[in-house]
Protein backbone atom coordinates (compact mmCIF):
# COMPACT_ATOMS: atom_id res chain seq x y z
CA UNK A 1 0.00 0.00 0.00
CA UNK A 2 1.30 3.46 -0.92
CA UNK A 3 1.66 5.73 2.08
CA UNK A 4 0.87 9.41 2.00
CA UNK A 5 4.01 11.45 2.45
CA UNK A 6 4.69 12.65 5.99
CA UNK A 7 7.24 15.44 6.33
CA UNK A 8 9.93 14.61 8.87
CA UNK A 9 10.58 16.88 11.89
CA UNK A 10 8.15 19.46 10.52
CA UNK A 11 7.63 21.41 13.76
CA UNK A 12 11.33 21.46 14.60
CA UNK A 13 12.10 22.65 11.09
CA UNK A 14 9.64 25.54 11.45
CA UNK A 15 11.07 26.45 14.85
CA UNK A 16 14.62 26.50 13.47
CA UNK A 17 13.67 28.39 10.29
CA UNK A 18 11.42 30.85 12.18
CA UNK A 19 9.46 32.19 9.15
CA UNK A 20 8.23 35.80 9.31
CA UNK A 21 5.62 37.68 7.28
CA UNK A 22 6.93 39.41 4.19
CA UNK A 23 10.13 37.37 4.06
CA UNK A 24 11.19 34.91 1.36
CA UNK A 25 12.28 31.31 1.82
CA UNK A 26 13.89 28.64 -0.34
CA UNK A 27 12.77 25.01 -0.09
CA UNK A 28 15.59 23.20 -1.88
CA UNK A 29 13.92 19.77 -1.88
CA UNK A 30 10.23 20.23 -2.67
CA UNK A 31 9.22 16.56 -2.92
CA UNK A 32 5.55 16.30 -1.93
CA UNK A 33 5.56 19.92 -0.80
CA UNK A 34 5.20 19.34 2.92
CA UNK A 35 7.81 21.87 4.00
CA UNK A 36 6.77 24.49 1.44
CA UNK A 37 3.13 24.27 2.47
CA UNK A 38 3.95 24.43 6.18
CA UNK A 39 6.12 27.53 5.69
CA UNK A 40 3.42 29.24 3.62
CA UNK A 41 0.79 28.44 6.23
CA UNK A 42 2.93 29.67 9.12
CA UNK A 43 2.73 33.33 8.05
CA UNK A 44 2.21 35.61 5.05
CA UNK A 45 5.62 34.87 3.52
CA UNK A 46 6.97 33.76 0.13
CA UNK A 47 8.45 30.40 -0.87
CA UNK A 48 10.53 29.36 -3.86
CA UNK A 49 10.78 25.58 -4.18
CA UNK A 50 13.28 23.48 -6.12
CA UNK A 51 13.22 19.86 -7.26
CA UNK A 52 14.90 17.97 -10.08
CA UNK A 53 12.12 15.36 -10.17
CA UNK A 54 9.66 16.23 -12.97
CA UNK A 55 7.04 14.05 -11.31
CA UNK A 56 6.48 16.65 -8.56
CA UNK A 57 5.43 19.43 -10.93
CA UNK A 58 1.73 18.56 -10.63
CA UNK A 59 1.94 18.88 -6.84
CA UNK A 60 3.77 22.20 -7.19
CA UNK A 61 1.01 23.47 -9.48
CA UNK A 62 -1.61 22.55 -6.86
CA UNK A 63 0.19 24.56 -4.20
CA UNK A 64 0.63 27.46 -6.60
CA UNK A 65 -3.13 27.52 -7.21
CA UNK A 66 -3.72 27.86 -3.47
CA UNK A 67 -1.02 30.43 -2.69
CA UNK A 68 -0.66 32.37 -5.94
CA UNK A 69 2.33 34.68 -6.22
CA UNK A 70 3.52 33.67 -2.76
CA UNK A 71 4.79 30.39 -4.23
CA UNK A 72 7.16 29.71 -7.11
CA UNK A 73 8.58 26.40 -8.35
CA UNK A 74 11.81 25.82 -10.31
CA UNK A 75 12.61 22.41 -11.81
CA UNK A 76 16.29 21.97 -10.97
CA UNK A 77 18.58 20.19 -8.55
CA UNK A 78 19.60 22.46 -5.70
CA UNK A 79 23.32 22.33 -6.51
CA UNK A 80 22.60 23.68 -9.97
CA UNK A 81 20.04 26.23 -8.85
CA UNK A 82 22.28 29.27 -8.46
CA UNK A 83 22.19 30.31 -12.12
CA UNK A 84 18.41 29.92 -12.25
CA UNK A 85 17.91 31.88 -9.04
CA UNK A 86 20.15 34.59 -10.47
CA UNK A 87 20.87 37.21 -7.80
CA UNK A 88 17.91 36.42 -5.57
CA UNK A 89 18.60 36.12 -1.84
CA UNK A 90 16.50 34.49 0.86
CA UNK A 91 15.71 35.00 4.54
CA UNK A 92 15.85 31.28 5.11
CA UNK A 93 16.80 28.09 3.29
CA UNK A 94 15.75 24.53 4.12
CA UNK A 95 16.97 21.20 2.76
CA UNK A 96 15.30 17.85 3.47
CA UNK A 97 17.79 15.32 2.14
CA UNK A 98 15.47 12.34 2.43
CA UNK A 99 13.63 10.55 -0.36
CA UNK A 100 9.90 11.26 -0.40
CA UNK A 101 7.20 8.60 -0.23
CA UNK A 102 6.23 9.65 -3.75
CA UNK A 103 9.52 8.15 -4.89
CA UNK A 104 9.83 5.24 -2.49
CA UNK A 105 6.31 3.87 -2.81
CA UNK A 106 5.82 4.08 -6.58
CA UNK A 107 7.26 0.88 -8.01
CA UNK A 108 8.04 2.35 -11.43
CA UNK A 109 10.49 4.84 -9.89
CA UNK A 110 12.77 1.95 -8.95
CA UNK A 111 13.74 3.18 -5.47
CA UNK A 112 11.99 0.68 -3.23
CA UNK A 113 12.91 -2.84 -2.18
CA UNK A 114 9.30 -3.30 -1.00
CA UNK A 115 7.67 -2.71 -4.39
CA UNK A 116 9.00 -4.58 -7.41
CA UNK A 117 9.74 -2.34 -10.36
CA UNK A 118 12.44 -1.38 -12.86
CA UNK A 119 15.80 -0.83 -11.19
CA UNK A 120 16.21 2.88 -11.83
CA UNK A 121 16.62 5.13 -8.72
CA UNK A 122 17.35 8.30 -10.71
CA UNK A 123 15.73 11.41 -9.23
CA UNK A 124 15.67 13.25 -12.55
CA UNK A 125 15.46 10.29 -14.90
CA UNK A 126 18.80 11.29 -16.43
CA UNK A 127 22.31 9.90 -16.11
CA UNK A 128 23.49 6.49 -14.91
CA UNK A 129 20.67 4.26 -13.65
CA UNK A 130 20.93 1.79 -10.78
CA UNK A 131 20.43 -1.04 -13.27
CA UNK A 132 23.34 0.12 -15.40
CA UNK A 133 25.60 0.48 -12.36
CA UNK A 134 24.69 -2.83 -10.73
CA UNK A 135 25.19 -4.79 -13.95
CA UNK A 136 28.44 -3.14 -15.04
CA UNK A 137 30.46 -2.41 -11.90
CA UNK A 138 33.19 -4.76 -10.75
CA UNK A 139 32.86 -6.48 -7.39
CA UNK A 140 35.30 -4.12 -5.65
CA UNK A 141 33.49 -1.00 -6.84
CA UNK A 142 30.12 -2.44 -5.81
CA UNK A 143 31.46 -3.35 -2.38
CA UNK A 144 33.07 0.06 -1.91
CA UNK A 145 29.86 1.93 -2.83
CA UNK A 146 27.66 -0.25 -0.62
CA UNK A 147 30.06 0.10 2.30
CA UNK A 148 30.76 3.83 1.93
CA UNK A 149 27.23 5.06 1.30
CA UNK A 150 25.28 2.38 3.14
CA UNK A 151 27.45 1.60 6.18
CA UNK A 152 26.88 -2.02 5.20
CA UNK A 153 29.33 -4.36 6.93
CA UNK A 154 28.42 -7.23 4.58
CA UNK A 155 29.21 -5.19 1.46
CA UNK A 156 31.78 -7.62 0.05
CA UNK A 157 29.48 -10.59 0.48
CA UNK A 158 26.64 -8.71 -1.25
CA UNK A 159 28.88 -7.56 -4.10
CA UNK A 160 30.15 -11.10 -4.67
CA UNK A 161 26.59 -12.42 -4.81
CA UNK A 162 25.58 -9.69 -7.29
CA UNK A 163 28.45 -10.58 -9.62
CA UNK A 164 27.60 -14.29 -9.39
CA UNK A 165 23.95 -13.63 -10.21
CA UNK A 166 24.89 -11.49 -13.22
CA UNK A 167 26.50 -14.53 -14.87
CA UNK A 168 23.07 -16.14 -15.25
CA UNK A 169 20.72 -13.18 -15.72
CA UNK A 170 20.61 -9.40 -15.83
CA UNK A 171 19.56 -7.65 -12.61
CA UNK A 172 16.83 -5.42 -13.99
CA UNK A 173 14.30 -5.04 -11.17
CA UNK A 174 14.24 -3.87 -7.58
CA UNK A 175 12.75 -7.22 -6.58
CA UNK A 176 15.69 -9.15 -8.02
CA UNK A 177 18.26 -6.93 -6.33
CA UNK A 178 16.44 -7.05 -3.00
CA UNK A 179 16.32 -10.86 -3.06
CA UNK A 180 20.00 -11.07 -3.98
CA UNK A 181 20.91 -8.90 -0.99
CA UNK A 182 18.59 -10.78 1.36
CA UNK A 183 19.97 -14.14 0.24
CA UNK A 184 23.49 -12.84 0.87
CA UNK A 185 23.02 -11.89 4.52
CA UNK A 186 19.61 -13.21 5.60
CA UNK A 187 16.95 -11.68 7.81
CA UNK A 188 17.63 -10.88 11.45
CA UNK A 189 14.60 -10.84 13.72
CA UNK A 190 13.56 -7.36 14.75
CA UNK A 191 16.04 -5.69 12.40
CA UNK A 192 15.44 -3.55 9.32
CA UNK A 193 15.10 -5.23 5.93
CA UNK A 194 18.56 -6.48 4.86
CA UNK A 195 18.19 -4.64 1.54
CA UNK A 196 17.76 -1.22 3.18
CA UNK A 197 21.41 -0.17 3.33
CA UNK A 198 22.32 -1.45 -0.12
CA UNK A 199 19.41 0.36 -1.78
CA UNK A 200 20.30 3.55 0.10
CA UNK A 201 23.93 3.29 -0.99
CA UNK A 202 23.16 2.77 -4.66
CA UNK A 203 20.60 5.61 -4.66
CA UNK A 204 23.10 8.03 -3.09
CA UNK A 205 25.79 7.01 -5.58
CA UNK A 206 23.62 7.13 -8.71
CA UNK A 207 22.28 10.60 -7.85
CA UNK A 208 25.61 11.96 -6.54
CA UNK A 209 23.71 13.14 -3.48
CA UNK A 210 26.77 13.91 -1.37
CA UNK A 211 28.52 15.76 -4.17
CA UNK A 212 25.41 17.83 -4.78
CA UNK A 213 25.16 18.69 -1.09
CA UNK A 214 28.82 19.75 -0.90
CA UNK A 215 28.52 21.88 -4.04
CA UNK A 216 25.42 23.62 -2.70
CA UNK A 217 26.95 24.39 0.69
CA UNK A 218 30.03 25.93 -0.93
CA UNK A 219 27.81 28.46 -2.70
CA UNK A 220 24.93 28.92 -0.26
CA UNK A 221 26.40 32.11 1.23
CA UNK A 222 25.63 33.86 -2.06
CA UNK A 223 21.86 33.40 -1.68
CA UNK A 224 21.36 33.74 2.09
CA UNK A 225 20.68 37.18 3.52
CA UNK A 226 22.29 38.47 6.70
CA UNK A 227 20.45 36.94 9.68
CA UNK A 228 19.00 34.36 7.30
CA UNK A 229 18.74 30.80 8.54
CA UNK A 230 19.97 27.58 6.95
CA UNK A 231 18.21 24.41 8.10
CA UNK A 232 19.29 20.95 6.95
CA UNK A 233 17.58 17.64 7.71
CA UNK A 234 19.81 14.66 6.88
CA UNK A 235 19.22 10.91 7.01
CA UNK A 236 22.69 9.44 6.68
CA UNK A 237 25.84 9.77 8.76
CA UNK A 238 27.88 11.00 5.78
CA UNK A 239 25.32 13.71 4.99
CA UNK A 240 25.23 14.80 8.61
CA UNK A 241 29.02 14.86 8.81
CA UNK A 242 29.22 17.11 5.74
CA UNK A 243 26.71 19.54 7.24
CA UNK A 244 28.29 19.45 10.69
CA UNK A 245 31.77 20.13 9.33
CA UNK A 246 30.50 22.90 7.05
CA UNK A 247 28.82 24.66 9.96
CA UNK A 248 31.90 24.23 12.14
CA UNK A 249 34.35 25.46 9.49
CA UNK A 250 32.27 28.55 8.71
CA UNK A 251 31.21 29.58 12.22
CA UNK A 252 32.94 32.01 14.54
CA UNK A 253 34.35 30.74 17.77
CA UNK A 254 34.58 32.58 21.07
CA UNK A 255 38.05 33.70 22.12
CA UNK A 256 38.78 33.98 25.85
CA UNK A 257 41.11 36.91 26.61
CA UNK A 258 41.46 36.08 30.30
CA UNK A 259 39.62 34.09 32.90
CA UNK A 260 37.95 37.32 34.10
CA UNK A 261 36.81 38.50 30.66
CA UNK A 262 33.75 37.36 28.77
CA UNK A 263 34.17 35.41 25.57
CA UNK A 264 34.70 37.70 22.60
CA UNK A 265 34.15 36.96 18.93
CA UNK A 266 36.84 37.31 16.33
CA UNK A 267 35.78 39.37 13.31
CA UNK A 268 36.38 37.23 10.26
CA UNK A 269 34.06 37.60 7.25
CA UNK A 270 34.97 34.07 6.20
CA UNK A 271 33.42 32.82 9.44
CA UNK A 272 29.94 33.91 8.47
CA UNK A 273 27.70 31.50 10.36
CA UNK A 274 26.41 31.23 13.90
CA UNK A 275 25.31 27.72 14.82
CA UNK A 276 21.78 27.58 16.23
CA UNK A 277 21.70 23.87 17.09
CA UNK A 278 24.66 23.03 19.34
CA UNK A 279 24.12 19.39 18.43
CA UNK A 280 21.93 17.69 15.88
CA UNK A 281 18.25 17.50 16.80
CA UNK A 282 16.50 14.15 16.45
CA UNK A 283 12.82 13.30 15.98
CA UNK A 284 10.80 12.40 19.05
CA UNK A 285 10.01 8.79 19.88
CA UNK A 286 6.38 9.60 19.13
CA UNK A 287 7.23 10.81 15.62
CA UNK A 288 9.34 7.74 14.89
CA UNK A 289 6.47 5.57 16.10
CA UNK A 290 4.13 7.28 13.64
CA UNK A 291 6.66 7.47 10.79
CA UNK A 292 9.43 4.88 10.83
CA UNK A 293 11.25 6.72 8.03
CA UNK A 294 12.05 9.47 10.52
CA UNK A 295 14.21 7.18 12.65
CA UNK A 296 17.57 8.29 11.24
CA UNK A 297 16.76 11.99 10.71
CA UNK A 298 18.99 14.72 12.14
CA UNK A 299 18.37 18.46 11.96
CA UNK A 300 21.06 21.12 12.10
CA UNK A 301 20.58 24.88 11.75
CA UNK A 302 22.75 27.98 11.53
CA UNK A 303 22.28 31.71 10.96
CA UNK A 304 24.22 34.02 8.63
CA UNK A 305 25.87 36.79 10.64
CA UNK A 306 27.63 38.32 7.61
CA UNK A 307 26.67 38.52 3.96
From Swiss-Prot:
Name used for this protein in its record: Ribosomal RNA small subunit methyltransferase H
GO biological process terms, semicolon-separated: rRNA base methylation
GO cellular component terms listed in the entry, alphabetical order: cytoplasm
Function: Specifically methylates the N4 position of cytidine in position 1402 (C1402) of 16S rRNA.
Organism listed in the record: Rickettsia peacockii (strain Rustic)
Family note: Belongs to the methyltransferase superfamily. RsmH family.
MF annotations from Gene Ontology: rRNA (cytosine-N4-)-methyltransferase activity
Keyword set, alphabetical order: Cytoplasm, Methyltransferase, rRNA processing, S-adenosyl-L-methionine, Transferase
